[in-house]
Amino acid sequence: MSIAFGGSIDDGRGHITGFLEHVDTDPILQGAYDGGACALSGGDARCGGSSTIPPGRWYDFGYKNAGYTPIDTSVSDYKFDYKLLGDEFIDRAGQLYNYNPTNHYQRPQDKINAGFFSKYSITDKSEVYADVRYTKNQSPSQIAYSGTFGDLRSVPCYNANFSEQIYNAVCGNWTGMGGSHAPNFATGAEALAYISSLNGQVADGSIIGYSAPMRSLKRNVEGGPRTYTQSYTNITASVGMRGDINDDWRYDISYQTSQVDYSQEIQNDLSVTKLLRATNVINVAGVPTCVSKLNGTDANCIPYNLFSGGLPGDGGIQAIWDANPEIQTYMAIPNFILGDSSETIFQAYVEGTTNFSIPGAPSAVSMVAGYESRELESDYRPDASAQAADRTGAGGPIVALAGGYDVKEFFLELGIPVTDNINLEAGARFADYSTDND
């Protein structure tokens, strides 16, 4: 929707034009079209995608390098590539996750533009002018569900949620690996003492370690797709005065100020810190309990059970479905990024025709001379977890930035006619920059 209006004032000495525009764009998902619903694959007659899959992919992440060897000496290939089905690990068999359907072809948008332009003649040779422009925009984007994305790289062998089959596959069948299958302790103190004893065995060389070095690629389909809602508001205003000095010279003096406020909200990505805590789980009185809750690191920790109830296809894991919504509230960390920038510009110049000319030239030299000052400041403020890259889908830390500069400039431009067909142009500019760090 767009509206524009305007008219003259004071018997034509002034004029005002205003406008208002509202843009409301509906989202279009890739899954709505045959050509976009399927991630491209290298020639296979199926959808491609990511190996971060709903039942969870687990693969070897350093058994051999750490010094672990299979108890069965006939096993020469240390590598494995599992997924969860029921309470057991089975071969992944190349399963991929088609991430296309939840992604946007077209993002939704809610945008308002408004403003006005005006001028008013003070005298026959001078006028004042002003304009204001306002924009408010919000656009949420959506991409595929979050996941562990390899940020979980080991799981303690005492994990309370391991079935016997899983325990044997990743712990019990390996020489040098410590930790019993799902031990149960009467108190938290006993559980912590047990972990301390395992650390002692590592220290004295009795065992190499007690955490299975396997990497997790689990798609969190039990939660919601990741969303990134970007919003900004901008207001720019300027005032000025311009007119004729005489028949040959004109002037223009103006001042402009602009302010932009920015925000971004990121939802449904998993916290790396909470992922590590929620998978370090031990039995206390028959209840799977986070070690971080026992040692006082995180009293709110909820176990993230990646090992019970793997469903076929893209169904996810039943244990996580059963723990919703509490587990998603704990695991899915929101991030907030705020920012703002401001700019002010002052400019004054004169332009006209001089009394100088090249002999034989068809007209005199024209000139523009002026001064401009600009001040700009910007501040980009990610929250602490964003700066620490505490999101499994982050790809790295988001760096905070802040700073500004100001500049003062003098400029001169000349238009020099030589003949009817030849003109020379010349210009000079002096600029003095200063930053906030000076």
What are these regions (language model features)?
Residues 1-24, 113-121, 129-133, 240, ...:
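Predominantly transmembrane beta-strands of Gram-negative outer membrane beta-barrel pores used
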Residues 7-9, 118-120, 239, 243, ...:
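Residue-level signature of outer-membrane beta-barrel architecture
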Residues 404, 431-438:
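Solvent-exposed loop/turn segments connecting transmembrane beta-strands
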